[in-house]
Amino acid sequence: MPEKMSEEKRALLRAYGAQVVITPMVEPEHPLSHYNVSKKIVSEIPGAFLANQFFNPDNVTQHYQTTGPEIWKQTRGKIDMLVGGAGTGGTLSGCAKYLKEQNPAVKIVCADPVGSILYDLYYHKKIVDPPGSYKVEGIGEDMLPGNVHLDIYDGFVRVNDQEAFDMTRRLVAEEGLLVGPSSATALIGAMKFSEKIEKPLNIVVVFADSGRQYLSKAFNDKWMVENDLLKEEQIKNSFNRVISAEEAIKFYSKK
């Protein structure tokens, strides 16, 4: 997995007994990219299997057969727009295919991190801005996965890291929703895209990650400050403030 992925994700894989191989953040065609390292490992280990989630059509099929119908059923068919991020593309493309079969008027919008090339490929049919680094995990790409079906999407919205991490913290503080930055990116995408529309819409937003996978990042004041996503003076009710029983008694006895 790429080195940008959180320690929580690495620890979870190790808990299941996996040997975790960390790859540098390099171009997709580089021999040390996670794409090529995984292919190399599979070629050398008898019986190894490469899920190839970026290009394996089964990825899209699963969401076409399960997630899409679930959304349609739970909304009773009253859905105007679906918004989500695209990493492998399986979730958004699979849901899009199913929902548009039920109602071609359903709009599919992809929220894309600033630094990803997908926005450019959709609107310009070419890469205008070279791939850049971003802290949001799981969505956005530096190449076009086979499972990102651009022809079935209806629009893209760009969201930067600051917006994503700010919203990640807001969602747990204001709504009690412990989700990750890719989910926050999707929500901001929905908010931005809906600003252009005058009539009320039923919008479904895909929250694809749990905040538990980002306790060391999005909910870590030190990491946020080090990555220029939080200023020291902004830290008031810190997520990382742990006090002793004696301190607590002393503090609350003053009130």
Positions of predicted regions on the chain:
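Active-site-proximal loop->helix
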Residues: 1-41, 118-127, 144-145, 215-223
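Active-site/ligand-binding loops adjacent to catalytic centers
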Residues: 34-36, 47, 101-181, 218-255
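Glycine-rich beta-alpha junction loops
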Residues: 55-58, 87-90, 112-117, 141-143, ...
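Surface-exposed amphipathic alpha-helices with a cationic face
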Residues: 96-103, 194
